[in-house]
A protein has these predicted regions:
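Short, proline-enriched alpha-helix->beta-strand connector loops that line the catalytic pocket
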Residues: 118-123, 150-152
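A conserved short beta-strand
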Residues: 99-109
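Serine-hydrolase catalytic machinery in alpha/beta-hydrolase-like enzymes
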Residues: 2-75, 164-166
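C-terminal catalytic histidine-bearing segment of alpha/beta-hydrolase fold enzymes
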Residues: 152-192
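Alpha/beta-hydrolase fold nucleophile elbow
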Residues: 73-83
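Short beta-strand/loop motif that positions the catalytic acidic residue
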Residues: 125-127
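Gly/Ala-rich beta-loop-alpha elbow adjacent to hydrolase catalytic centers
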Residues: 82-86, 90
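Conserved alpha/beta-hydrolase "acid-adjacent" motif
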Residues: 132-138
């Protein structure tokens, strides 16, 4: 319990004001938050444009950038967090970091290797229900694989919310779901 060191990764829209606002919210709750810019200043108006740029950079390069941004802050253990695509980045890093203190996933997950093993890593996922990028079958399989890997997983579903429902600048925004998300996320971080 106390101040967590958090690295918060943006979605395929890039490092937008909503990510900075989320970081400020977490800082106001007493945490240290880093917000790496994996897209090096580029932001996008549509998810399709952002996904095309993500694919142009490539998974390996994006993970390299994420590791380089996180490494200087990881001595005492990080909480990895991210929005949508950023959640998948956060998940990859958290599952590979034996010092990881937690994983906070906002609107997105990633596949994991069959041999992934963690020691009761606390994980909290916040996801729209339904979500256009994370089907019920996918989420069920993801949950079971994370549990089998040893993670302590908590899932919060938000019926009727849009995919990136915590971003007030997008049509997906749902103020009530966003507020419930931040309340639960703050409680999760306080429990670590």
């Amino acid at each position: 319990m106390g101040c967590m060191n958090i690295v918060l990764f943006h979605s395929t829209y890039g490092l937008r004001p909503a990510v900075h606002a989320a970081a400020d919210r977490l800082r106001a709750a007493g945490h240290q938050v880093q917000v790496p810019d994996l897209f090096e200043g580029r932001t996008f108006e549509t998810v399709e444009e952002g996904m095309a740029y993500r694919d142009e950079i490539g998974r390996d390069e994006l993970l390299r950038r994420a590791v380089l941004a996180s490494a200087p802050h990881s001595d005492q253990g990080l909480v990895y967090a991210g929005f949508s695509f950023g959640g998948s980045v956060a998940q990859h890093l958290a599952l590979a970091d034996e010092k990881a203190r937690g994983l906070l996933l906002l609107h997105g997950t990633a596949d994991l290797d069959e041999d992934t093993a963690v020691d009761e890593l606390p994980v909290q996922l916040h996801i729209a229900d339904p979500d256009p990028f994370e089907t019920h079958d996918w989420l069920t399989a993801w949950y079971l694989r994370m549990r089998r890997a040893g993670a302590d997983v908590e899932v919060h579903r938000y019926p009727g919310a849009g995919h990136l429902f915590t971003d007030p600048d997008l049509d997906d925004y749902d103020a009530e779901a966003a507020e419930r998300t931040w309340k639960a996320a703050t409680g999760f971080l306080d429990s670590l």
